[in-house]
Amino acid sequence: MSNDEINQNEEKVKRTPPLPPVPEGMSKKQWKKMCKRQRWEENKAKYNAERRVKKKRLRHERSAKIQEYIDRGEEVPQELIREPRINVNQTDSGIEIILDCSFDELMNDKEIVSLSNQVTRAYSANRRANHFAEIKVAPFDKRLKQRFETTLKNTNYENWNHFKFLPDDKIMFGDEHISKDKIVYLTADTEEKLEKLEPGMRYIVGGIVDKNRYKELCLKKAQKMGIPTRRLPIDEYINLEGRRVLTTTHVVQLMLKYFDDHNWKNAFESVLPPRKLDAEAKSASSSPAPKDT
C-alpha cells in the first residue's frame, strides 16, 4: 500500500466517529445502520451543498469543452450534447406500461431508494422519447410512497404528464379501457419472446430491485394472475454476463425506443452501453423487417 493510500485511510478513520455503545436489545448491525442514517440526516445540507458545487463545476467544464470544439470549427461530440428535458415533437405510442411495485416487503431500504430513482428516470425517459407511453405505478404505497412524499416531494410527481400513481393493482387485471387478454407481463424468466409491441396493449414491468435474489418472482405472479408472459429479446442482442435482468429504467427506455423504427436491435444498441452488446448477435441480425423484439 502506498503512502497516499495509507494517508487516505487514516483520514477516513478520522472522519468516521466511533460507534456509541450498542443499546440493549439491538444488534450491532441495526445500531450501526441507525447511526449511519442519523449522521446522514445531520449532514444532509452539507452533502447537498457539495453536490450542487460539483454539478456546477461539471456543467462549466462541459460548456468549456463544447466551446473549444466550436472555436476549432469542429463538430461537437454527441456525448457532450445534452438531450432536451422535454421532447415537444412526441407522438403517442399507443401502449400502456404498468410498473408493478407490489414487492415492498422483499426489498431493503437501500433498494427502495434505488427503485424510486428508477421510477423518476423512467418518467424522464418518457418525456424525452420520440414516442411516449401512458405509464402507471401500481400499487403506489408503503415505503415507495413515503419516499416520494418526503425526499422526492419537490419532483411534483402528482402532476407528471402521462405518468400516474395508483393506490392499488386493480389495473393489472383489466378495466373498461383494456381487457385482460390485452395485458402481458414482461419477465426474463419466460421462454416466449416478445416479437413486437402493439398499440392498445398493456405491458407490466416488475418494479423490484433484488440483485436476483428472488428467482421467477414475476413469472410466478403472472401465472397466478392468469396473465401471459413474454421476455425482451435479450439473448438475441446483448451479453449480460450471466444476468439477463435489466433495470426497470432500461426496460422502459427500450420499449419507448422500439417505436422509432420498430427494430429491437437498434433499440438495444441505442439504449444499452456498447460494452454490453453481443457482437455475435449484432452481426447475425440485420434484417430490415425484424422479428427481433
UniProtKB/Swiss-Prot annotation:
All residue ranges annotated as the SAM-dependent MTase TRM10-type domain in the record: 83-279
Result of altering residue 247 to A: Reduces catalytic activity
Assigned keywords, A-Z: Coiled coil, Cytoplasm, Methyltransferase, Nucleus, Phosphoprotein, S-adenosyl-L-methionine, Transferase, tRNA processing
A molecular-function term among this protein's GO annotations: tRNA (guanosine(9)-N1)-methyltransferase activity
Domain of life: Eukaryota
Phosphothreonine: residues bearing it: 16
Residue positions, PTM Phosphoserine: 283
GO cellular component: cytoplasm; nucleoplasm; nucleus
Binding site for S-adenosyl-L-methionine: 186-187, 206, 210-214, 218, 232, 244-246
Location in or out of the cell: Cytoplasm; Nucleus
Effect of residue 210 to N: Completely abolishes catalytic activity
Residues forming the catalytic site: 210
EC number(s) per entry: 2.1.1.221
GO biological process, one term: tRNA methylation
Region of interest called Disordered, as start-end residue ranges on this chain: 1-31
Leading EC class: transferase
Reaction catalysed by this enzyme: guanosine(9) in tRNA + S-adenosyl-L-methionine = N(1)-methylguanosine(9) in tRNA + S-adenosyl-L-homocysteine + H(+)
Main localization, broad class: cytoplasm
UniProt cross-references to InterPro entries, sorted A to Z: MT_TRM10-typ, MT_TRM10-typ_sf, TRM10/TRM10A, tRNA_m1G_MeTrfase_euk, tRNA_MeTrfase_TRMD/TRM10
Family: Belongs to the class IV-like SAM-binding methyltransferase superfamily. TRM10 family.
Additional detail: Present with 4090 molecules/cell in log phase SD medium.
Description of how the protein assembles with itself and partners: Monomer.
Protein name: tRNA (guanine(9)-N1)-methyltransferase
Species per Swiss-Prot/TrEMBL record: Saccharomyces cerevisiae (strain ATCC 204508 / S288c) (Baker's yeast)
Lineage: Eukaryota, Fungi, Dikarya, Ascomycota, Saccharomycotina
